[in-house]
């Protein structure tokens, strides 16, 4: 075990939350010189390896924005990946450090276990062996190699920024820290697996001795999220949306656009542009929410494992979820091919329900063709997926952290937790399932869809059972600890931390509407008050979260325009 500069870094992190910049720049360019040198200059220059637009508007919008594009036809894949990573690490060093310190202090309690470090090294050795032994024209491993190159050089650019900008050397980070930021979702399952391997006691929802302990473990293992795919009754539109559930200390947010002009075997990948809600220092969303230029939307919510029966199947000789989703996004031409690619080299970590919406197969006024909606669910050593467009044609597809496929439901231990604790663990009758059944088919516009994804009206909604955590965008900070009816939930700075939505027209135009922070449509905006600011580090965040919707495009973010039909909308559910 190693303890890393805890008290000093905690102090710096808190100071950083006050000093964090709120500026919009005119762009940056990264240049390459032989044999392996990269340097960053302000401004955008077409002869560089890659160009970036970056703004940190956390204090005014709840978001930062990063758009990185590579120059076309000038450099090979390894230099494009290295340059893009170096550039991002260099210009967003402050925010990466804030994100890491919030995670390090709150999640790892200032200690990284040697078992985690060793597993990462074993996994990297496996990946390098597979890359080296794969045929030179193997698309999968070529793409994995670019991902590893990008993160390696992100760390290098980050540390060079620390040096060049006179930042305290204690802020330098190793490759382990960068991998842990990207593995945040995978650690939900890898952490318990390593603990069991080391002979430690691991409580699961299935072995809990009380409903409250069971639900606490359930939330820890399935902390992400709510999602909804909604086809309007007149078949004129198809909405896709996602609300991330997470600890509030993780609200240092960065919406990202990658437009990296790779050529694999002389051809570009199916998808060249990826837009996603993410975090400083991460190459994947982790939420997850992606809009691709192939007109495919990729979303997930976490199912998790309710028992410990499958953790022994997790091995370092696999590809972690955060890498597999990047590769699948690039190579997929539709829902089925996405599922086929993602299923390869299953790590058994971050066991999610993946929702793949192919807008190429949605026809306005006609509806959804077969293949519009694919659903994939994963557990260690097993993946199941299929075309679920028929369900979408009934009006909507909901997702709320409970498995859809019967085999997955059984393998993950939900049968046992349902038998013991009832409808909290029921696909058909859990609180969010019932809310979607009641309200989803009352959505007719984008404004209403946004309101649904941000929905929290726990005081008046009977399905909340008097609890602010039982809503589409939960607010566990509002849970009343001494409520005699509350046998399940404890108050915590945890809940829905954002929402992202698209319509058919927005997908075609590569636009995303996004709102950051806990839901405040019907509730008081969340504030880091004395109840929470002494319990958690929240470097880089505003004190109060009261922000509106933003529209993200390829090169900017701006306040979202009111929907043209908003005047006639009724956005009150329940």
From Swiss-Prot:
Annotated glycosylation sites: 159, 195, 415
Enzyme class: hydrolase
GO cellular component: extracellular region
Location(s) in or outside the cell: Secreted
Protein name: Phospholipase B-like protein A
Enzyme Commission number: 3.1.1.-
One Pfam short name: Phospholip_B
Function recorded in the entry: Phospholipase that removes both fatty-acid chains from phosphatidylcholine and produces the water-soluble glycerophosphorylcholine. In addition to phosphatidylcholine deacylation, it also hydrolyzes phosphatidylinositol and phosphatidylethanolamine.
Gene this protein is translated from: plbA
Membrane-spanning parts: none
Keywords for this protein: Glycoprotein, Hydrolase, Lipid degradation, Lipid metabolism, Secreted, Signal
